[in-house]
Amino acid sequence: MPVESEHFETLQLHAGQEPDAATSSRAVPIYATTSYVFRDCDHGGRLFGLQEPGYIYSRMMNPTADVFEKRIAALEHGAAAIATSSGTSALFMALTTLAKAGDNIVSTSYLYGGTYNLFKVTLPRLGITTKFVNGDDPNDLAAQIDENTKAVYVESIGNPMYNVPDFERIAEVAHAAGVPLMVDNTFGGGGYLVRPIDHGADIVTHSATKWIGGHGTTIGGVIVDSGKFDWKKNSKRFPEFNEPHPGYHGMVFTETFGNLAYAFACRTQTLRDVGGNANPFGVFLLLQGLETLSLRMERHVQNAFALAKYLEKHPKVNWVSYPGLESHVSHKLAKKYLKNGYGAVLSFGAKGGPDQSRKVVNALKLASQLANVGDAKTLVIAPAYTTHLQLTDEEQISAGVTKDLIRVAVGIEHIDDIIADFAQALEVA
């Protein structure tokens, strides 16, 4: 029977699934199939014409992915979701469903390095430009919106600045201009720490590779449509949702799909044509991660806060950045929006500058030095020399990256062991 609970802990286990009708399997099966049998020619025609819901081809939809999509949509308070092959593919398809050559997006400069590079280098090759705003002040973002802007973009917890945007004010200025707010909520832990849609976001993306999967075993992403943006009211800015579509014999998406016009366009146009779909085997691993997400996030944020407070008092540490600390620039907004903890990632710099910070990273034993976050294990990296290496020095500063910055994605090991590892590294470096 359908789950009616609003509790995150229950939804992460049950939303989007009923036991398999044919086998009564309690676990979500892996549907390793490319395609699905039509009852007859007319049935196949109705499916291809989007006149009837159902499965056609696994590049667009898959029963295993369908459970994951419904579960994430429930956890994020969205109306629909699309599973993708990675977080980057989720972001790329989420944006290119909205924007075409000649359009732009307005974005904070506080971004993950891969996203910054996508916006700066790859999207311009398609004729889509980005207006970068230094910081995330709502008025500064609003000032950059013009008639060709298709989205305002921020991260729920910036990587690696850990700024927390004022979602409600940013949504207000974006909506006043008829523009949707898109939020990457990867650092929000699948909606456990914050649900941007509750605060005005229209589209949410995730790298499900991170805390959703939680074990460093597979790559995946997801796009969530709030179902709240009025595409019909803003038809001049978004004609593709409001005019006859040449690929579907003149179908008008807002008339056929109403508030889910964006989600259907993303699936039946962008996902179909780009091919960034999620693999059912990978989705199965993501579903395993989802089942313990709240439990892991509790330990992640508990450990991160404890490590941040330890490092803040350490005589060999120059500075610490973590939203839970009163010294952090976003502490007040973090208290407002992050109701289940201040995040699972922190940064710090060692006294002695960049060379000393690099020595500390190299001296760590328990923590793994690699390019990922959200694993159950503690992970570290020096972003200036890795994830943000492609940025110029000026761009690194605008993204919140300094040469001495050590990023720590705090795991769920015993906190005494985590602290002991950093203590010995700071001592021997």
From Swiss-Prot:
Protein's gene: met17
Enzyme Commission number(s): 2.5.1.49
Enzyme class: transferase
SUPFAM superfamilies in the cross-refs: PLP-dependent transferases
Name by which UniProt lists this protein: Homocysteine synthase
GO cellular component, one term: nucleus
Taxonomic source organism: Schizosaccharomyces pombe (strain 972 / ATCC 24843) (Fission yeast)
Pathway stated in the Swiss-Prot or TrEMBL entry: Amino-acid biosynthesis; L-methionine biosynthesis via de novo pathway; L-homocysteine from O-acetyl-L-homoserine
Top-level division of the source organism's lineage: Eukaryota
Entry function: Catalyzes the conversion of O-acetyl-L-homoserine (OAH) into homocysteine in the methionine biosynthesis pathway. Can also use O-succinyl-L-homoserine and L-homoserine as substrates. Also has cysteine synthase (O-acetylserine sulfhydrylase) activity in vitro, but in S.pombe, it seems only to be involved in the alternative pathway of methionine biosynthesis under cysteine deficiency conditions.
Modified residues (N6-(pyridoxal phosphate)lysine): K210
InterPro entries cross-referenced by the UniProt entry: Cys/Met-Metab_PyrdxlP-dep_enz, Cys_met_metab_PP, OAc-hSer/O-AcSer_sulfhydrylase, PyrdxlP-dep_Trfase, PyrdxlP-dep_Trfase_major, PyrdxlP-dep_Trfase_small
